[in-house]
Amino acid sequence: MTPQRIGFVASSAPVAQEALNVMAARYGQCPLPEADAIVALGGDGFMLQTLHETQSLDIPVYGMNRGTVGFLMNGYAEDGLRERLAEAEEEILNPLAMTAVTGAGEVFHRIAINEVSLLRAGPQAAWLKISVDGKVRMEELVCDGALVCTPAGSTAYNYSAHGPILPIGADVLALTAIAPFRPRRWRGALLPKTALVRFDVIDAQKRPVMADADGRSVRDVVSVEIRTEPAVRHRLLFDPGHGLEERLIREQFV
């Protein structure tokens, strides 16, 4: 079925705002809750923001690249948008759920589509204890940080930290160390998608750590739990032959 009601959103970048004016004038602007499809104009950062802000609507989101990074975006063109939406392939993503506890006892819940990362927040290296499904797997990881990512997020920060690119259909998560000092050669692990990963910060006052879920940070954490959230799903639309699986393969040969 060809979507008739389209809701457009755009980043604050001038090129994205210009595209918003052009596309809304040409195809009409529908309130997002009433739309058949949402079109996000910007880069990957804005796409993540849009997915977070619209996750309760269960409406597919089609990105058009008007930013600097476009891994999650389709090419921008003013013509034939309804036809492209009708022919698009849909990918369903389940995000990560993060529960972070601070030294003051505050509890923060965040959703992350790409990754949850723990990063040292001072000059001292972070000391982390890692547990998986209630069993301690590493008593002490000395590092700049660590992250857990989804397959969709494996080409982002995870890949920059020398983590593996995961097939989009794989029921696994990547746990990747960021600049590990001890164990020096330990890079991380592949875990089942159902795993509950827990990080406990050792000597948190001397070695402060922050947790970050897709750019939303919590400072001075003492523990962080991460798991897949099956109750939340994000629907992404891609042009035929340019879905996430193809993009993940292509990224490895750049």
From Swiss-Prot:
<feature type="binding site">
    <location>
        <position position="179"/>
    </location>
    <ligand>
        <name>NAD(+)</name>
    </ligand>
</feature>
<dbReference type="InterPro" id="IPR017437">
    <property type="entry name" value="ATP-NAD_kinase_PpnK-typ_C"/>
</dbReference>
<dbReference type="InterPro" id="IPR017438">
    <property type="entry name" value="ATP-NAD_kinase_N"/>
</dbReference>
<protein>
    <recommendedName>
        <fullName>NAD kinase</fullName>
        <ecNumber>2.7.1.23</ecNumber>
    </recommendedName>
</protein>
<dbReference type="GO" id="GO:0019674">
    <property type="term" value="P:NAD metabolic process"/>
</dbReference>
<dbReference type="GO" id="GO:0006741">
    <property type="term" value="P:NADP biosynthetic process"/>
</dbReference>
<feature type="binding site">
    <location>
        <begin position="155"/>
        <end position="160"/>
    </location>
    <ligand>
        <name>NAD(+)</name>
    </ligand>
</feature>
<dbReference type="GO" id="GO:0046872">
    <property type="term" value="F:metal ion binding"/>
</dbReference>
<feature type="binding site">
    <location>
        <position position="152"/>
    </location>
    <ligand>
        <name>NAD(+)</name>
    </ligand>
</feature>
<dbReference type="GO" id="GO:0051287">
    <property type="term" value="F:NAD binding"/>
</dbReference>
<dbReference type="GO" id="GO:0003951">
    <property type="term" value="F:NAD+ kinase activity"/>
</dbReference>
<keyword id="KW-0808">Transferase</keyword>
<feature type="active site" description="Proton acceptor">
    <location>
        <position position="44"/>
    </location>
</feature>
<dbReference type="GO" id="GO:0005524">
    <property type="term" value="F:ATP binding"/>
</dbReference>
<keyword id="KW-0520">NAD</keyword>
<comment type="function">
    <text>Involved in the regulation of the intracellular balance of NAD and NADP, and is a key enzyme in the biosynthesis of NADP. Catalyzes specifically the phosphorylation on 2'-hydroxyl of the adenosine moiety of NAD to yield NADP.</text>
</comment>
<keyword id="KW-0521">NADP</keyword>
<keyword id="KW-0547">Nucleotide-binding</keyword>
<feature type="binding site">
    <location>
        <begin position="114"/>
        <end position="115"/>
    </location>
    <ligand>
        <name>NAD(+)</name>
    </ligand>
</feature>
<feature type="binding site">
    <location>
        <position position="144"/>
    </location>
    <ligand>
        <name>NAD(+)</name>
    </ligand>
</feature>
<dbReference type="InterPro" id="IPR016064">
    <property type="entry name" value="NAD/diacylglycerol_kinase_sf"/>
</dbReference>
<dbReference type="InterPro" id="IPR002504">
    <property type="entry name" value="NADK"/>
</dbReference>
<keyword id="KW-0067">ATP-binding</keyword>
<keyword id="KW-0963">Cytoplasm</keyword>
<feature type="binding site">
    <location>
        <begin position="44"/>
        <end position="45"/>
    </location>
    <ligand>
        <name>NAD(+)</name>
    </ligand>
</feature>
<dbReference type="GO" id="GO:0005737">
    <property type="term" value="C:cytoplasm"/>
</dbReference>
<comment type="similarity">
    <text>Belongs to the NAD kinase family.</text>
</comment>
<dbReference type="Pfam" id="PF01513">
    <property type="entry name" value="NAD_kinase"/>
</dbReference>
<keyword id="KW-0418">Kinase</keyword>
<dbReference type="Pfam" id="PF20143">
    <property type="entry name" value="NAD_kinase_C"/>
</dbReference>
